[in-house]
Amino acid sequence: APEFYRLRIANQIINLSVDSTETITVKASYPKMSTGYTVSGSEECATIKDLAIKQINLQSFVIGIENNPAIGYDAAEDNIRKVIEQYKDFIKRNYIYKQPMKASSYFALFQALGQRLIFNPRESKEDIKAFAAVATSWDTYYPGSLRGENLHNIAIEGMKNVRIMQNKLAESQQGIDPSKVHTSNIIEIALPDNHGNMRRITDLVGKAVLLDFHV
C-alpha cells in the first residue's frame, strides 16, 4: 500500500504519496512552496497537488465569506455549508468514486478546513458511502493494509452513529406516549367549565384542556 509523507517549512506543506517502486522529484521554493512546487515521477502526487490546491482555494473562499461584513451570521453559515457540499460533490464524482483505489482518493477523504474534516464520517450518510467505497477498493488492491482497515472502522462507526441519530429523530417525531406520563405531587385545582360544572385537574389527565383565566 502507498505511504503518505509531508515536506514542510513553517506553514508551507507539500503532501506526497509514495509507492516503493517510484522515484519522485520535487522542486519548490519558500515561501510559496505549497502551491508553487512541481512534482515528477508520480501521477498520484500530481493528483494530490491538484486536490491540495482545490482545498486551499476552498478555505480562502470560506474565509472570505466569514469576513464579509455585508453577510449576516446565519446567511454566512448557510453559504459556507452550500459551498462545502458543492466541493464534496465535485470531489466524489471526479476523484473518489472514479478511482477509489488510488492514494489520492484516500487523501481526499481526510482533507480539512481548520480542525474540521470536510468529509464528515460521523454524521453524514453520503460521506460515509465515500469512506466505504475507498475501504472496499483498498481491500481488493491492498488486502490487510492498516489504512484500509482504518477506513472500514470509520465507515462502520459512522453507520452506527447515523442509525442512532435516525432512531432518536423517529422517536421525537412520534411524540409523547400518554401511557408513559405520570403525575405526582400536583396541586389540585377545581374550576367551573363554560357550562358551570366543576372540573378538577386530576379528572382531566390525558386530555387536552384550554384554561381561560379572566377577570
Label the model's feature ranges.
Residues N11, N194-G196:
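Glycine-centered tight beta-turn/hairpin loop motif at sheet-sheet or coil-to-beta transitions
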Residues A75-N79, L117-D127:
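Short coil/turn connectors between adjacent alpha-helices in alpha-solenoid helical repeat scaffolds
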Residues P100, R122-E126, P143:
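Structural signature of alpha-solenoid helical repeat scaffolds
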Residues I128-P192, T202-V205:
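N-proximal helix/coil linker or "cap" segments that precede and/or mark the start of modular domains
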Residues N197-V215:
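Short active-site neighborhood of thiol/selenol oxidoreductases, capturing the structured segment around
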